[in-house]
Amino acid sequence: MKDNYILAFETSCDETSVAILKNGSELLCNIIASQINSHKRFGGVVPEIASRHHVEQITVCIEAALEEAEISADQLTAVAVTEGPGLNGALLVGIMAAKTFAWANHLPLIPVNHMAGHLMAASLVDTIEYPAMALLVSGGHSELVYVEKEGSYKKVGETRDDAAGEAYDKVGRVMGLTYPSGKVIDELAHKGQDTYNFPRAMMNTHEVEFSFSGLKSAFINLVHNENQKGNDVIANDLENLAASFQVAVVDVLMAKTKLAMEKYPVKTLIIGGGVSANQGLRERLSAEITDEKLIIPPLRLCGDNAGMIAAAAYIEWKKGLENVQAGLDLNAKPSLVFEDM
């Protein structure tokens, strides 16, 4: 049987990435050009800057991927690309590159939901036993997705306001940390204690929904009130502040994930998205999820990368190209959700 090679593009935010996946499981390369240093001084991603960097890096990444994988264009089976959700201009760079490459090399084009990519990154680590539940947490999303069978996605819960990663970045700015601040907060949290008892929103409801805006506001108000009293709590108690914030976030994520698994019994729990790199969350999951198979991707697959897009595209390819193939009129879908698939 002829080998399947998928060339995938990911440019939804601030990482330019191109990957090649063999037979749905062997990641031959996963080239990632990060833009963190360009956005750091602004305290967050600047869409126009992100798009310009994608334009500069995309061709370099394609060439690097083909060279590292030792694959030529005529060996490829299909081209895959993130169509959304994400930043419109950033998405368009990847889509135009993918369409051009597919057209020039007479290859089918497979559009992929970015969040399905985060979910299917787990398939590059271990075999997913269905049905499965996925906790997807990042700077822009916090949602729980039920996967009854391969390629079937049903969002069963999401945040009502801020995403978990967004809360981390906003709290990080108050703490005086540089963007992105999630890793530093995680490191500080491991040195402190939960002494401030920040609110855990919706913990006692039976709704599979998150809310982090109240926690963020409580953190900001505490810092402000302490400063008014002459207590520079950021300077004097940073580690305990970080620990208190992180424990509150993880408590909510764990509670709602367990609730979702009660409502939708599963064999596997998957974690994905940038916040899945958080050691506090990974430790709690490993300690408390014992009855179901737990798949936590390695750090290299937690952030945005084209390898995960290739993995999701392979699942789509198995459905039959007549059902999933896009035309050259494919456009960006910045607000794409699972229900649109």
UniProtKB/Swiss-Prot annotation:
Gene Ontology, cellular component aspect: cytoplasm
GO BP term, pick one: tRNA threonylcarbamoyladenosine modification
EC number: 2.3.1.234
Keyword annotations of the record: Acyltransferase, Cytoplasm, Iron, Metal-binding, Transferase, tRNA processing
CDD domains: ASKHA_NBD_TsaD_bac
Binding site for Fe cation: H114, H118, D304
Residues holding substrate: L136, V137, S138, G139, G140, D169, G182, D186, N278
Keyword Cell inner membrane recorded: no
GO MF annotations in UniProt: iron ion binding; N(6)-L-threonylcarbamoyladenine synthase activity
InterPro entries cross-referenced by the UniProt entry: ATPase_NBD, Gcp-like_dom, KAE1/TsaD, TsaD
Cofactor comment: Binds 1 Fe(2+) ion per subunit.
Location(s) in or outside the cell: Cytoplasm
Pfam families named among the record's database cross-references: TsaD
Reactions performed catalytically: L-threonylcarbamoyladenylate + adenosine(37) in tRNA = N(6)-L-threonylcarbamoyladenosine(37) in tRNA + AMP + H(+)
Function: Required for the formation of a threonylcarbamoyl group on adenosine at position 37 (t(6)A37) in tRNAs that read codons beginning with adenine. Is involved in the transfer of the threonylcarbamoyl moiety of threonylcarbamoyl-AMP (TC-AMP) to the N6 group of A37, together with TsaE and TsaB. TsaD likely plays a direct catalytic role in this reaction.
Protein family: Belongs to the KAE1 / TsaD family.
HAMAP family named in the record: TsaD (MF_01445)
Protein name per UniProt: tRNA N6-adenosine threonylcarbamoyltransferase
Lineage, broadest ranks: Bacteria, Bacillati, Bacillota, Bacilli, Lactobacillales
